[in-house]
Structures are given as structure tokens and as C-alpha cells.
Amino acid sequence: MNPYQRASPRTASPASNLQTNPTRTNNPRHSADRNSYFDNPPYNDRGSEDGEDDMASRGDHMAETDQRQYQKINQVIQNFFTKSALSIVSSRVILPTSFNKNGDIRQNKWFNVILDDSDELQLRLTEWKTMDAMAGQHPPLYIEVYLDISGLGHKQSLVVHDEDGKRWDVAAALNAAQPTSRASSRPARPTQIVIERWKIYVGDIDSVHPSDLTEPLPNVYKKAVVLFRGLYANLRLLPAFKYNKSMAKQPANHTSLKLNYRILNGASERPQLDTLSLPLCPSTDPITETAHIGSTNSPIGPLCISVEYRDACEFSVEDSESLLSDQFMGLDDTYLEQKPRAAAPVPGSLPVDKLNTQETPDVGQAYGSLSTFHQVGPPTGTSPISALRAARDMPSSSPIETPPQKLPPNHRTAQGSKSSLRSNDTSSFQRRTSVSFQPFKAGSLSSSPAPGPAGPASPSSSLGRPTSAFGRNINIVPNSLNQPRNRTSLNALPQAALRAPSLPNDNAIASSASSSPKPAPITRYSSSFGHRRGKFSTGGSKTEEDALSSGKGSATSSLQRGSDTLNDGEGGSSGEMRSEDDNISDFLKLLEAKKDLKSFNRSDSSTRDATMRKTTAQLGKYQRMRDSHAQLSDSVSSSTMLHRSSSSSSRQLSSVPAMIHGTSISTASSPGKPISPHTPHTPAIPSRLSANSIIEYDQPHRSRNHRSRSRSGRTARGQGPENLEEQSEVEDDAAGIDIPLSPRPWNYQRRSSSVAQQNRNLPEDEPDMFGVRAASLPVEEGDRARDLHRITSTDLTSSGLFAQTESLASASRDNQAPDDGDSRDDLPRASSTSNTPAKRGTYSSNLRGRGGFFSQGSSTTGSTGGTSSTERQSRYNFNSRAANLDDDEPLLFQMSEIGAGGSRRSLEEARGGSSTGSARGRNSPWGGR
């Protein structure tokens, strides 16, 4: 049996022939109307082979399968449009959610991206949800994201910030772009600014290879999943998404514009004005950018998504008044930049070929408040704004032709120090520094002004607040007025000008009757604050000085009408300030060719005398301040050194406080230099005295109070009135330290120092030579015994023995003189040979109160006497002064006479030679009997 014999009838059947059956859908006559996707169906539909009775049912089944495939392709394309719109709009706008039958939020899960669905958006996308894409009905879908300013209040404006941070009004840009072609029917004002425009469309089928159009539908779906993931990421990288997030973070009470959207068909009519590409602010960058998100192939062609978006989306809602203020500031900026300015010249450049060199002064020099305005050019007004406006109206012609002058230095370019800017070639209206002075020290002559032929400066102008010279034109100033001016301070003035100021010279003002100007002062002291009135301290009111220093008395605050100059009234008497006309005398010099103003020409003798007196008083005041502050400086430094000297001396006198006056022991000083009470007793040059100044304490401890009582009861004997002055000089020479006091011809009442009245026990090393003795003991016998004890002392050194012997010999010669002490038996006596200070004696209060050296006169320098010292001993006698008042004894020693008769001795040698000091004490009022 041949199996092919059974199949032959079926093959011969006309119904089974695909090429001849006209009822079949796969007839070649209909191939042009059919999609190529159905020529090779993705799913294999095997027909029934039961017989010819099943041919009709099998044809109906293939038609149903093709219809189902057709619907699936349309469904994929429709969801591609709707899911793209949902992804875009949901990332820009908060959509109302929709719910299913169970009450749950309905979600869209197409293309493996889960998003909350919204009925509102689906209603707007009805056209694309019902389109027959296979039939060619697939219009492009446009989604525009925009801002609408119609919802803002009347005081609110939408602004956009450029890359420099400047704000620009969006409404102004929209109004400027509004078409004005229709005059009769005026169109509505545009209020929407488009941020993004999305386009979802089917691309050209011819741009895709035919093999890509026949891909199975599952592959088309999978490729679309990748495209939507890329769309989801790109949506969050664009500027509109950042703006939407920033608006979501704003508080509820903050006014902000939300993004809106609209769905447009590509074939529908668009608004007349496309605001997507409308420039909102001046910029060189492109306004919009276009991005192609991607495409995926489908049986009807490539499915594409693209976007055109605005690059600058820094929008905000601002107050209209604040925006208007910014616009005014912008106008000011453009106003200052309207006229191009040439490069500012520097000093020393080539001559200028035009006359008016200050026609357009440097704007950078205009600074300060409205009442204190300074610039390098002429004073053109009372505020920077009015000055800048008046700068354009300055005259450019001059009635006098003079050789071209050098330009003033531009302080923007010449950044040197003040000293480097001092030049003799600067012009008359150059900005100058203010006069400064230091009242504590006298100024040096190194910075004195250059000598001029006219002598010192005229004191007619204020020296405390120097004048400032402003002028219209440098070339209208005569050559006699173009004198070099140095910026000089008050402490650098010549001494001759400080002591004897000359009479003021008249200002150089051109008179209407004469063309020759009056002589002008050569040297002036000028300042950048010269428009203020000069301030003196000769009894003027404090209120006026404060007003001047704060700028209230600025000369630029009063502009005289019709005179083009500044005037502030007439001057006063000699105790008041002179008129401010003198402060702007330099400006008047430049008005040579104009009408003579009598108010500026004050040359009467009363004005000159008043000015001279005020200037002299001012200079004398600071000259006196110099001396007082110099003494104050020296006193401060001396007190610092005194503390250090007292601290070092207190180590030797441990029981006495270091800072109590009188406890600091000095062993040497510079001869010939008076030492003040605050001068530290420190030897300037090391000597033998300072090298051997440690005191050895080996004497018994005694009370000061007891010793002072015994001294006050003694009387000086053996001294005549003619020896009082000589003895005081010896005591001056024998003293260990200089305690200067002002010399007085008589005693003065002085209270005893509280420190001197304290009863303290001194260390044992301070020997009491005459403090404790019986009142009935003869003076001569006690002194002889004490002298013998001194000479025969075992611890006496050789130098001390020689000093004691010399002192005893000198005392014996003095005893040969007639004893005139009977006339002074009632005087109190005190011992200066004692090594301890007197506490309650006759002169103890003066010693302790003045911070002087306690009484170590003969003991400290006991061997310094000599014949010459004895002759000088009576310059200031103690007994002659103590006769008037017990508690008043100012000591005045002469440091220049220490060491004149012999060499200095140390404290050890002085203590060893105490017997010699006692021998001398017989003829001395300090230890005489």
C-alpha cells in the first residue's frame, strides 16, 4: 500500500491550495492589505485533518486567532502610551488615587513598573486607550508641564534666578513676548510658562529593518520593560523634578507655585504662544534642551519617547516691592556703566592734551554717607548720587590757558603707603590725609615740610581739622598757587612755627576790580576731611565738637544758592570758631576769573589777631601736655624698677616688709643726678660698695621705740650757730642715699607717717650706738668709752680700723673750737651714726613718709668723711629745723657730693668704723653731746 495515494485527492482539492482559494485570508491578492506580522504567526495553529467537513471550522478558528493577536498588539501599544503618560505626570504632579472594588488602591503594573493609577489621568487619555494602532490610528501624545502665574496675588511675582543669583520677573518676559498684531481684538495676557514637553509617538516604520518588525510579541513587551525603567530614572534627573521636590518641602503657609500638566494631541490646536523656548533672563546658554529617552520596536513601528525641557528652573515667588527694588539697583548699576571710562592715569605720566582733567572723576573715590562725601573731583553735591549726576555738567573750558599739569594720583592704582604718596607734583585738589598729633611725645623734625620762600604756614586755617582743597579745573590755578604741599602732621611742624606763628596771609582770591590775585600761603596742612570745620580745644563746647566729629557740621550739607560754593555762616569772636569759608579757601583760589565774593575776603586785623591767639593757645597747650606726659611715662617706668629693687633688698631685711618706704637699701648711685622718690635705688655701675653690701647682723636686738625716745631727749652740745650750715653739709655727704625734696626756706607742717609710728623690733644685727643710755651718764665719758670699744673690737677689719681712726682724729680737731652748744641745749637731738632708723624721733616721720633711706648716715659711709666733707657738713642742719617742729624734718641729701672726699665703703666697713662715726658725732647735730 502506498501511503501517498491517499493524500493525492486532498492535495488536488482546490480548497487546500493556498494560491487558488479566493476565500482564504492568506490569498496573495490580500497580502498587501495584511500586516507582515500575520504571515508568520507566533503561535502554530494546526488545523484539523479529519476531513473536508472540518475545513470550514478550521478556517474560522484561524480567523479568531489572528483577531486575538491583533488585539494583543493594540493593547501593548495603547498601554505604552498610557503608562508613559502616567509615569511622567505622577513624577511632576500629585494625582488623585483610584480604588478597585475591594477598596484598595488600583495600581498599574504594566511593563513591570508599579504605579498608582488615577482615574483623572485615564479620562484625559481616553483617545489613546481606544485607538486602533494596527489600523494606523496612533496620534502622538504630548504632555506639557507648566507653571501658571494667574493664581498669584497682586503683590506677588514669579521670578527666575539666573546663574549669578539675580532675580528676573517672569511676567515681564511673558508680556514682552505677547504678540501685538491684532489691534482690535486684544488677546489675553499669557500666564503660563512651559517647563517640559514630552512626546510619545510611533516612529517611522521605514527606519526599522523589516526583520525587527516580525519579532514575537513577548519580545516586544520585554524590550519595552527596559525602556520604561530608563524613563523612570530620567524623569528624576531633570530640573522639573528638582523644582517639584523643593516645593514639596516648603511649609504650608509658604506661597509657591505647583506644577501643572496638560495632555495634547499632536493634531490638536496649540496655544498661540509657545513659552517653552521663551527667554526669561539674558543668557548666552541655550534655553531648552532635547533628550531622546529611547525606543522599542513593535509590529507597527518603533515606539519612541522624547522630551524638550527648560534648563533653568530656579523659580520662586517673591514680593513685588522687593523685586522692584532690585530693578532700581540694576538701573543704578547700568547708570554707572553707561559712559565708558578710560584708564585712570598715574602721577608722572605724559602731559594731558585736554584742559579739564577732572571732568569725569573716578567713581571709586565717591564714598561715605550722605553727609560726609569725599571724592577726588570737585564738590558736586551733598550726596553721592547727586554728585555723580552733577559730574556730567562740569564745565570743560577755562578762561585762563596754562601749561598742562600732571594728573593727581589715582588712589585705586597707586596703592603705596602714605609716605610714598608725598609728592611735590601733586595737584591742588588731591585728596589728602588728616592732620594727626601725639600729645605724649614731641614730634621729630625729620618729617618737617619742605622750606618755602613764604616762611611758615599761615595759622588762619585750622590746624586741628585742616582744610581740603577742591577745584573745578587744575589749569585755572595760577602758577603762584601751584606750590608743593606735603601732608604734614602737627608734631612735625618746625619749632619756629610752633613758638611764634606768623600773621595769616590772605587767600588768593581774584578780585573783580583787579586781575592779579592776592598772595596765598605757600604751605598748607590739608586733609581728606577738610570739608569739616576746624576744631579747637580752647574752651569750646563739647556739643559742637561732637557734631563736627560725627559729620553733622559737614560743609557739604549747606550749598549757598547761586554761588556754587559752600558757606556756613560768619565767624565769631576770638574765643569762637572762624567762618568755614577759610576751610574751603583752596576751592576759592580756583574761582579767580569769577565774581569776587566779599564774604570770603576777611582780612581785617581783628580776625588775624583772634586766629593768632587761638593758634598760640592751641600749640602751647600741647607743648605743656608733652612735658606732663613725659614725666608720667618716666614715673611709670620708675615705679616698676622700684618694685624690683625693693624686692631684692627685702631679702636682707627679712623682718621688714619689702614695699615699705625706707627698707630698700641702696649702696651706690650715679653722682650728680638727682633721684626722685620714685627712682629705683639701683647702682648704675658696679662698685666696691655693691660687691660687699651684705650686712652682718651681730648686735643685740633692741626696740626702736626705746631708741627713739632716748634720741629725742638729747641736746646738741659743742656746736655754734655758725657751724649749723657746715654740719648739715657733712651729714649730706655722709648719707648713704639721696632722698631729694624740694628745698624750702622754712619748715612746713607735716603729719607723721603711720608707718613710722609702728613699733617693730628690728633684727639683732642693727647696733644701737646711742639709743639706750642713762640720762645722768656724762656724754663725754660715754662717748670715750664707746670710741675705745670700737677701736679695740676684735672683729674690726684693717680698713674699718683706719676709718675709725681717721674719724676720731677729725672729731678731736673739731672739739678744739669753742663750745657754743649752750645756746641750743633745748633742741632735740638725734643720732645719725646709728645703723637703725628713728621711729618716733624728731625726723622719723619725714624719713619714713618720703620713702627715704633710714638713718645710716655715718654708719654706712663712715669713712667717707675727710676734711672736705666736714667743711660741707652744715648745709642743712638738723637741729636748726627740728627746733621749730619735732615731727617735721624734710631731709635733702646731695648725691653729687657722695664720695667727694674719699672712696665709698661697704656696710661692713662702715659698721667696723662705728667708733670713728661716733667721734664725728660729737660735733654733729645727729650724735653730738
From Swiss-Prot:
<feature type="compositionally biased region" description="Basic and acidic residues">
    <location>
        <begin position="600"/>
        <end position="612"/>
    </location>
</feature>
<feature type="compositionally biased region" description="Polar residues">
    <location>
        <begin position="551"/>
        <end position="566"/>
    </location>
</feature>
<keyword id="KW-0653">Protein transport</keyword>
<feature type="compositionally biased region" description="Low complexity">
    <location>
        <begin position="855"/>
        <end position="871"/>
    </location>
</feature>
<keyword id="KW-0072">Autophagy</keyword>
<feature type="compositionally biased region" description="Polar residues">
    <location>
        <begin position="412"/>
        <end position="437"/>
    </location>
</feature>
<dbReference type="GO" id="GO:0034497">
    <property type="term" value="P:protein localization to phagophore assembly site"/>
</dbReference>
<dbReference type="InterPro" id="IPR018731">
    <property type="entry name" value="Atg13_N"/>
</dbReference>
<feature type="region of interest" description="Disordered">
    <location>
        <begin position="600"/>
        <end position="770"/>
    </location>
</feature>
<dbReference type="GO" id="GO:0005776">
    <property type="term" value="C:autophagosome"/>
</dbReference>
<feature type="compositionally biased region" description="Low complexity">
    <location>
        <begin position="912"/>
        <end position="929"/>
    </location>
</feature>
<comment type="similarity">
    <text>Belongs to the ATG13 family. Fungi subfamily.</text>
</comment>
<feature type="region of interest" description="Disordered">
    <location>
        <begin position="1"/>
        <end position="66"/>
    </location>
</feature>
<feature type="compositionally biased region" description="Polar residues">
    <location>
        <begin position="368"/>
        <end position="385"/>
    </location>
</feature>
<feature type="compositionally biased region" description="Low complexity">
    <location>
        <begin position="635"/>
        <end position="656"/>
    </location>
</feature>
<dbReference type="GO" id="GO:0034727">
    <property type="term" value="P:piecemeal microautophagy of the nucleus"/>
</dbReference>
<feature type="compositionally biased region" description="Polar residues">
    <location>
        <begin position="8"/>
        <end position="29"/>
    </location>
</feature>
<feature type="compositionally biased region" description="Polar residues">
    <location>
        <begin position="476"/>
        <end position="487"/>
    </location>
</feature>
<feature type="compositionally biased region" description="Basic residues">
    <location>
        <begin position="702"/>
        <end position="714"/>
    </location>
</feature>
<dbReference type="GO" id="GO:0000423">
    <property type="term" value="P:mitophagy"/>
</dbReference>
<feature type="compositionally biased region" description="Acidic residues">
    <location>
        <begin position="723"/>
        <end position="735"/>
    </location>
</feature>
<keyword id="KW-0963">Cytoplasm</keyword>
<feature type="compositionally biased region" description="Basic and acidic residues">
    <location>
        <begin position="55"/>
        <end position="66"/>
    </location>
</feature>
<feature type="region of interest" description="Disordered">
    <location>
        <begin position="342"/>
        <end position="487"/>
    </location>
</feature>
<dbReference type="GO" id="GO:0015031">
    <property type="term" value="P:protein transport"/>
</dbReference>
<keyword id="KW-0813">Transport</keyword>
<dbReference type="GO" id="GO:1990316">
    <property type="term" value="C:Atg1/ULK1 kinase complex"/>
</dbReference>
<dbReference type="GO" id="GO:0019887">
    <property type="term" value="F:protein kinase regulator activity"/>
</dbReference>
<feature type="compositionally biased region" description="Polar residues">
    <location>
        <begin position="749"/>
        <end position="761"/>
    </location>
</feature>
<feature type="region of interest" description="Disordered">
    <location>
        <begin position="503"/>
        <end position="581"/>
    </location>
</feature>
<dbReference type="GO" id="GO:0005829">
    <property type="term" value="C:cytosol"/>
</dbReference>
<dbReference type="GO" id="GO:0000407">
    <property type="term" value="C:phagophore assembly site"/>
</dbReference>
<feature type="region of interest" description="Disordered">
    <location>
        <begin position="808"/>
        <end position="929"/>
    </location>
</feature>
<comment type="function">
    <text>Activates the ATG1 kinase in a nutritional condition dependent manner through the TOR pathway, leading to autophagy. Also involved in cytoplasm to vacuole transport (Cvt) and more specifically in Cvt vesicle formation. Seems to play a role in the switching machinery regulating the conversion between the Cvt pathway and autophagy. Finally, ATG13 is also required for glycogen storage during stationary phase.</text>
</comment>
<feature type="compositionally biased region" description="Polar residues">
    <location>
        <begin position="830"/>
        <end position="847"/>
    </location>
</feature>
<comment type="subunit">
    <text>Interacts with ATG1 to form the ATG1-ATG13 kinase complex.</text>
</comment>
<dbReference type="Pfam" id="PF10033">
    <property type="entry name" value="ATG13"/>
</dbReference>
<dbReference type="InterPro" id="IPR036570">
    <property type="entry name" value="HORMA_dom_sf"/>
</dbReference>
<protein>
    <recommendedName>
        <fullName>Autophagy-related protein 13</fullName>
    </recommendedName>
</protein>
<dbReference type="InterPro" id="IPR040182">
    <property type="entry name" value="ATG13"/>
</dbReference>
